[in-house]
Amino acid sequence: MIVTLTLNPSLDRAVEVERLEPGTVIRATRATLDPGGKGVNVSRALLAASVPSRAVLPVGGPEGDQLVRLLRAEGVDVVAVQIRGGTRSNITLAEPDGTITKINEPGPTLSADELDAITEAVLAATGTADWVAACGSLPPGVTDDYYARLCGRLVSAGIRVAVDTSGPALLAAVSAGPTVVKPNREELAEAVDAPLRSVGEAVEAAQVLRSKGARDVLVSLGSDGALLVSEQGVVSGNAHVAEPRSTVGAGDALLAGYLAAGADGSAALAEGLAWAAAAVALPGSRMPAADQIHRTAVRLHDRTNLSRPLVSSG
């Protein structure tokens, strides 16, 4: 069982357009409405591949009710913690060439009592859990050390923890000793306050996070693939996608596949890459079913080329 926590979930509307032209009326060629949020997407990806998961999330207002309905319609085991504020809505605009424009609301402010209730819900959900994946941005009212404090309690209880966040929250969480953190290139660069122009620089930055407390660092690099830096060394890989549709949720699918495969070494990285590639081939933030995951598309690199330049933000 993998428990996920999404502190700032959303309703995600994805709209496909032929071309985004500011200041004009644009006709959509396709629109979808999906549950959103990093942890939510991890649970959805796990469910689609028949891996047991439970999603803990705060919800409020009509949008929150709709979010829970959508998740339960997909079969997700939801632990909904009611809050006074309304769940946010996000919009993604996708163009045929793969260009993505996102409009994300900040989300509701959480009170101290609401945050305590969420924490207790996570702890109560971990009875048979192998992992807790704490994912996404922190909503207003939540201090940067929240994931670190939660991670500390979970690690003390013998539960493995994955953290996917950014900025000060990522740096604080690393100090609490999570099993794995999953930044993308931009988030990793922000964490070390330096540009990452090559694979080698990304590896060095990941080692910095390991030196601060993270056991493993899984870095999503977009079209450049992904990178795993751990006690066993460095392994990298990528997966070809013939017809990309949307990158929304690809990093979440990467983490889900990695955790589902045991979160250890090159085999887990390969599984994560296969899940991520399958997600990119789907519209909006749809997560791939088991029969949509093509592992033959994955290529792991026996020797990571540290001088290879990075072209994608991840």
Model-predicted regions and their roles:
Residues 1-56, 65-66, 241-244, 306-314:
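Glycine-rich phosphate/adenosyl-contacting loop at the front of the ribokinase-like
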Residues 2, 52-54, 78, 161, ...:
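Hydrophobic anchor at the start of a short beta-strand
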Residues 18, 47-129, 297-314:
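Conserved N-terminal subdomain of the carbohydrate kinase-like
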Residues 44, 89-93, 225-229:
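Short beta-strand scaffold segments in enzyme catalytic cores
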Residues 108-111, 138-142, 169-172, 190, ...:
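Short, small-residue-enriched loops and turns at beta-alpha junctions
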Residues 126-139:
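Short acidic, glycine-rich surface-loop motifs adjacent to enzyme active sites
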Residues 145-161, 165-232:
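Conserved phosphate/ATP/ADP-binding segment of small-molecule kinases
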Residues 200-314:
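Conserved phosphate-binding/catalytic region of the ribokinase-like
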